[in-house]
A protein has these predicted regions:
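Outer-membrane beta-barrel pore domains
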Residues: 24-25, 63, 75-76, 232-240, ...
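Short, solvent-exposed loop/turn segments at secondary-structure boundaries
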Residues: 208-213, 418-422
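Bacterial Sec-dependent N-terminal signal peptides
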Residues: 1-24
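Outer membrane beta-barrel
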Residues: 39-63, 70, 74-206, 212-219, ...
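Outer-membrane beta-barrel biogenesis signature
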Residues: 19-51, 62-71, 249, 401-402, ...
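Short, charged N-terminal helix-start/capping segments
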Residues: 22-55, 113-117, 214-224, 270-282, ...
């Protein structure tokens, strides 16, 4: 009977305390640092916490079977669907330090269960340096430390999905690797407002079961936490990724100019290209500005990426396995890309109502434009077409744990000479989502 009562009290404590989970992937919520003397009755469980959220939703597309980045493409004969976008449960454990109020170690395990199956999303261990409380080491499966949108948890992101560029270049956001972080925990430290991450990752993320070559991605990010001045705050960061993957063939296509002056892909078929590294380099910068009012807040976010992305003739998506067709490796296409995300968030009337505006674009090949794509002999494909998405949304907060999200995403594509892309596609999506977090 005592064990049953203890378990019940523990469940109530964990549930109540875990409403505020960490806002960013792989971060540790400071409210989780609980001393054994706070609640002696449940001190054996005080450092264990269970959090999670569920996102059932209904969507309507502007046409049947569209390719979409709003939760995945629609079935060939369908333009509406109910789906369980995410349903996640996360177990966290913090090992208290004997010398400070900060943890000595932190373990996290998160699973995602939907109608499409169950998959692991996080499984990592974070060790803290407890003498000066400045450094930590993370190893396992966790979020890549690149950019703001990629690391903002889906439990807190206002629009239903991350931008197209995030999903193509950083599919599923996480990867297996190890990372060192500099983040002074003492607020009196002059650098306590800064965080620096530096990590090595396999590169394939959750899109592959194992690393298909020995090349690793080096990812770093320096982030300035919100600097507050009265009701105004500003934060921002710089990110860098340097990696790549091995060419499976000797054929490597790069941007060039044809004899008639057209922008084309030119093939390099040097035998030495086999097993050479196709460069993958990203550069990113982001800023977040927020103004608080008695009745709510106004927030603006901007983020810009550019760099080099290896892919195939048909896609610029970062691969989880070596790209092949009929068992044979595919030629590598090197593209130079850029893209951005812009958010505007505004409370209206009070904190229960929030208006959302978002704009993002992804240009997979900045060396070519519009009618150049689709010309015979250029080797250009739909994978070189620029897409932009404008989104408008509304959130109604029923309570601290429950909200209703309504959004409409309008997608525009470059008008090209490519069959099927000589006009605007009909691929807009309306989403109605119920979001509950615990």
């Amino acid at each position: 009977m005592k064990k049953a009562i203890l378990f019940f009290l523990t469940f109530l404590f964990i549930t109540r305390e875990s409403i505020v989970a960490q806002r960013f992937l792989a971060d540790v919520d400071s409210s989780f640092y609980i001393k054994d003397t706070v609640r002696p009755v449940i001190k054996r469980f005080a450092n264990l916490r269970i959090t999670g959220y569920i996102q059932p939703q209904f969507q309507v597309a502007s046409a049947n079977g569209i390719e979409s980045y709003e939760g995945g493409s629609f079935s060939a004969h369908s333009q509406s669907r109910f789906m369980l976008r995410r349903a996640r449960v996360k177990i966290e454990y913090a090992l208290p330090s004997k010398t400070s109020g900060n943890p000595a170690a932190f373990f996290a395990f998160q699973v995602d269960g939907t109608e499409r199956g169950v998959a692991v999303r996080d499984m990592f261990l974070k060790l803290f340096e407890t003498r000066k409380n400045k450094f930590s080491f993370t190893a396992g499966l966790f979020g890549r430390p690149f950019g703001y949108e990629v690391n903002l948890s889906s439990a807190y992101r206002e629009m239903p999905e991350r931008g197209r560029m995030s999903q193509i270049l950083m599919p599923r956001e996480r990867d297996i690797g190890a990372m060192v972080s500099f983040e002074p925990m003492n607020k009196k430290n002059k650098l306590s407002n800064f965080k620096f991450d530096l990590g090595l990752f396999n590169g394939q993320g959750l899109t592959g079961s194992t690393d298909f070559d020995s090349r690793k991605d080096l990812i770093s990010r320096v982030y300035c936490k919100p600097y507050e001045l009265n009701d105004f705050s500003i934060s921002g960061g710089l990110s860098f990724l340097n990696g790549g993957w091995k060419n499976g063939t000797k054929y490597v296509y790069k941007n060039g100019v044809g004899q008639n002056g057209d922008a084309i892909f030119i093939v390099d078929s040097t035998q030495a290209n086999i097993d050479e590294i196709a460069p993958r380099r990203y550069y990113g910068a982001d800023i977040q500005v927020k103004k608080e009012f008695k009745w709510g807040a106004t927030e603006f976010r901007a983020e810009y990426w550019f760099g080099t992305q290896p892919g195939t003739s048909s896609t610029s998506t970062s691969p989880g396995v070596l790209p092949v067709a009929n068992g044979n490796p595919l030629p590598t296409y090197i593209r130079h890309f850029n893209g951005a995300f812009f958010y505007f968030l505004q409370n209206i009337i009070n904190e229960k109502h929030q208006l959302l505006l978002k704009y993002d674009w992804y240009d997979p090949n900045v060396k070519v434009k519009k009618q150049q794509i689709g010309k015979p002999g250029t080797n250009l494909t739909p994978a070189d077409i620029k897409f932009a998405t404008s989104g408008i949304g509304y959130i109604y907060h029923l309570n601290k744990q429950t909200r209703v999200i309504l959004s409409y995403s309008m997608v525009s594509n470059e008008i090209t000479a490519m069959p099927g892309f000589a006009s605007q596609l009909s691929d807009n999506v309306f989403t109605c989502r119920l979001h509950f977090i615990f």
